[in-house]
Each structure stands twice: as structure tokens, then as C-alpha cells.
């Protein structure tokens, strides 16, 4: 529960702490600048995209269950998450607050009655 008594949208503090410990044990804090972490995050997102590159829509929907791609999907999703959490921790960003606020903003940009069933950008609704 947070200060207002609500459950967090996401709970990541244990992961942030584990990543902090992992970096400290290896003396990697010196390399974990925001710039380096974001660059690494971009690389990992690219590796995730590479798993899906040239797949059909149908194949992409089954990628996490397909024995030939499932492990890569899991690994790259995990890498992306690890870098997001580590970057947020280094930058002092409360991901729960950021995600909660972003969900609120997106709900305003994309009201259900105007956006249900279409993929138009909020500026075109």
C-alpha cells in the first residue's frame, strides 16, 4: 500500500534492490550512468525486436510459446525490464508514481467512447 492506502500499480522495489546489489558486487555502478543504461536498454529492445523481425502476425502471437523463440522472447523481455528498473533507480524515478500518472494521462488522451476499437493517435480522435 502507498501513502494514500492504494495498492501500487507495479511493485518493483525488490527488483531494484537486487539490481543495485548485483551492480555493487561487480563495481559496475561507475558504468551505470543514465546515458549508458538507456543505450543498453535501447540495444536490448532492439534484440527483442530482432526476435520478431519478419514473423507473420500469427507467428508473433505465438512467439512466447514456440520452442524456437520462447527462450529468446523471455530473455529479451527480462533484459528490457532490468534496464528500465535500473535506469529508474539510478535516476531516482518512482516507477509506480510514473506509471500511475501515465495511465491517468493516457486515459484522458484516449477516452473509451472515442478510442474503442480503433488505432488512431489521440490527436486524430
Q: What residue ranges belong to the model's regions?
A:
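Flexible "arm" and connector segments at domain edges
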Residues: 1-125
Amino acid at each position: 500500500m502507498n501513502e494514500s492506502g492504494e495498492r501500487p500499480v507495479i511493485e518493483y522495489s525488490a527488483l531494484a534492490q537486487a539490481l543495485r546489489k548485483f551492480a555493487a558486487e561487480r563495481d559496475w555502478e561507475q558504468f551505470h550512468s543514465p546515458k549508458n543504461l538507456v543505450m543498453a536498454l535501447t540495444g536490448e529492445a532492439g534484440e527483442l525486436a530482432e526476435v520478431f523481425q519478419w514473423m507473420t502476425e500469427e507467428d508473433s502471437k505465438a512467439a512466447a510459446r514456440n520452442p524456437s523463440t520462447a527462450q529468446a522472447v523471455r530473455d529479451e523481455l527480462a533484459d528490457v525490464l532490468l534496464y528500465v528498473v535500473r535506469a529508474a533507480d539510478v535516476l531516482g524515478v518512482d516507477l509506480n508514481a510514473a506509471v500511475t500518472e501515465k495511465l491517468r494521462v493516457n486515459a484522458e488522451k484516449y477516452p473509451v467512447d472515442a478510442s474503442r476499437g480503433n488505432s488512431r493517435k489521440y490527436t486524430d480522435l
